Amino acid sequence: MEQNSRALIDGFNRKIDYLRMSVTDRCDFRCVYCMAEDMQFLPRQQILSLEELFQVAERFVALGTRKIRLTGGEPLVRQGIVELCGRIAALPGLRELCMTSNGSQLGRLAQPLFDAGVTRLNISLDSLDTDRFKQLTRTGDLAQVVAGIDAARQAGFKRTKLNCVVLKGRNDHELVDLVRFAIDRELDITFIEEMPLGTISEHERGESFCSSDEVRERLAGQFTLIESTESSQGPARYWRLAEAANTRVGFISPHSHNFCATCNRVRLTVEGRLLLCLGNEHSVDLKHVLRAHPGNPERLEKAIRDSLHLKPYRHHFEVGGEVQILRFMNMTGG
């Protein structure tokens, strides 16, 4: 990777070159680990406009960011999202523009997103059972999501990745089937330990926790897992399958194998808070900077640079412990 003299370096000498941007807190699903069933969403005036989102993206790319991931809520329910993708994708120096989606809108938007310059998709898929999928998402239609997954492949997306949050007693018996689903479609799949964000009522996190080591041990009974050194510039650790050359299995393990030492990313909430760590509340209000100093990229750049001293070395998630972070995942950016 080329060095940029303006690159963002935090207090622990970690280069920050990956920005996760939430473009909306709204979603057409109500996943049990992500938000409350009666979630109250932000009024429009409190969220960043598409132009403000672009201005932040432009500044980060100018400061050496090489990967941007658009998240939500569900990013595809934000009006104007395809046009925003096209503008961000065209920024000189950006290598990857990725998106995390629940897949519900990909049937109609996969091709426009690909044409706009989105390079990769992550699609959430927590169950292959229609009823269980509905229970976990509260409102989701499995057939619609599968159609969206297939539409992404037809549109030309490569290395599409499925994301599965593993909940013991709810979907952990589907692990092998989910991998086989990924193999059949030549997709990658990542299993994620649930992150303790927001107070939920659907399950007890301590009881539903399933570690990445346990998931890997179960999969090893059916597949030959070969550890890989490949990276997607994010927190996932990957294994290849001897049985399937075109599928990788990844693990994101915030509890059992935290990835803080090599953290290269920050998050922008749709409210304009620049979060320096997923598991801490250290943040800077970029919305205030954008609105108090419109059309002043130097002030925005200074705020971004000054924020880095707030980035902690690590989070301190605890399985089953008292919730320390009250914001839900949809407010953070999944």
Swiss-Prot record:
Binding annotation for [4Fe-4S] cluster 2: 260, 263, 277
Domain Radical SAM core: 11-236
Domain of life: Bacteria
Biological process according to GO: Mo-molybdopterin cofactor biosynthetic process
GO MF annotation list: 4 iron, 4 sulfur cluster binding; cyclic pyranopterin monophosphate synthase activity; GTP 3',8'-cyclase activity; GTP binding; metal ion binding; S-adenosyl-L-methionine binding
Annotated GTP binding sites: 20, 69, 100, 161, 265-267
Keyword S-adenosyl-L-methionine: yes
Cofactor: binding details: Binds 2 [4Fe-4S] clusters. Binds 1 [4Fe-4S] cluster coordinated with 3 cysteines and an exchangeable S-adenosyl-L-methionine and 1 [4Fe-4S] cluster coordinated with 3 cysteines and the GTP-derived substrate.
Record-listed S-adenosyl-L-methionine binding positions: 33, 73, 124, 195
Known pathway: Cofactor biosynthesis; molybdopterin biosynthesis
Binding-site list for [4Fe-4S] cluster 1: 27, 31, 34
Any Pfam family: Radical_SAM
Enzyme Commission no: 4.1.99.22
Keywords associated with the record: 4Fe-4S, GTP-binding, Iron, Iron-sulfur, Lyase, Metal-binding, Molybdenum cofactor biosynthesis, Nucleotide-binding, S-adenosyl-L-methionine
Stored InterPro entries: Aldolase_TIM (IPR013785), Elp3/MiaA/NifB-like_rSAM (IPR006638), MoaA (IPR013483), MoaA_NifB_PqqE_Fe-S-bd_CS (IPR000385), MoaA_twitch (IPR010505), MoCo_biosynth_MoaA/MoaC (IPR050105), rSAM (IPR007197)
Keyword S-adenosyl-L-methionine tagged: yes
Catalytic activity as recorded in UniProt: GTP + AH2 + S-adenosyl-L-methionine = (8S)-3',8-cyclo-7,8-dihydroguanosine 5'-triphosphate + 5'-deoxyadenosine + L-methionine + A + H(+)
Reported cofactor(s): [4Fe-4S] cluster
Function as written in the Swiss-Prot or TrEMBL entry: Catalyzes the cyclization of GTP to (8S)-3',8-cyclo-7,8-dihydroguanosine 5'-triphosphate.
Self-association state and partner proteins as the record states: Monomer and homodimer.
Family designation: Belongs to the radical SAM superfamily. MoaA family.
Name assigned to this protein: GTP 3',8-cyclase
Organism annotation: Pseudomonas putida (strain GB-1)
Gene name, Swiss-Prot/TrEMBL: moaA
